[in-house]
């Protein structure tokens, strides 16, 4: 674990990403999260294992380019986003949707 997030692992994971592709990846026990853009793979692994009490087998991260946003004549950039696809050990699950 890097020193940037030492003791603040809850700040690493921002939210789960619920898309069609991410939902289909749940069948392979892969979960997609939006994470802090400064987080490294050891930070993400430690945060997921501690917050959800599961065992992480692998992590894939991607840093897509920032998108431009225009409002009237003003242009700006959207916030930096980093996505992490976390693969869990067999038998471990994360409850993303509440039971009805």
Curated annotation (Swiss-Prot):
Gene Ontology BP, a term: translation
Keywords tagged on the record: Ribonucleoprotein, Ribosomal protein, RNA-binding, rRNA-binding
Highest taxon above the source species: Bacteria
InterPro entries on file: Nucleotide-bd_a/b_plait_sf, Ribosomal_uL23-like, Ribosomal_uL23/eL15/eS24_sf, Ribosomal_uL23_CS
Disulfide bond positions: none
Keyword Protein transport: no
Subunit structure: Part of the 50S ribosomal subunit. Contacts protein L29, and trigger factor when it is bound to the ribosome.
Role this protein plays: One of the early assembly proteins it binds 23S rRNA. One of the proteins that surrounds the polypeptide exit tunnel on the outside of the ribosome. Forms the main docking site for trigger factor binding to the ribosome.
Family according to the record: Belongs to the universal ribosomal protein uL23 family.
HAMAP family the UniProt entry points to: Ribosomal_uL23_B
Official protein name in the record: Large ribosomal subunit protein uL23
Lineage: Bacteria, Bacillati, Cyanobacteriota, Cyanophyceae, Synechococcales
Designated gene of the protein: rplW
């Amino acid at each position: 674990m890097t020193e940037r997030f030492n003791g603040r692992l809850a700040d690493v994971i921002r939210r789960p990403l619920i898309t069609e592709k991410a939902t289909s990846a749940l069948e392979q026990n892969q979960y997609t999260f939006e994470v802090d853009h400064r987080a490294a793979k050891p930070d993400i692994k430690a945060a997921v294992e501690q917050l959800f009490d599961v065992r992480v087998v692998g992590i894939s991260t991607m840093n897509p380019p920032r998108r431009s946003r225009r409002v009237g004549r003003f242009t700006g950039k959207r916030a930096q986003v980093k996505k992490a696809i976390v693969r869990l050990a067999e038998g471990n699950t994360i409850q993303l949707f509440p039971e009805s």
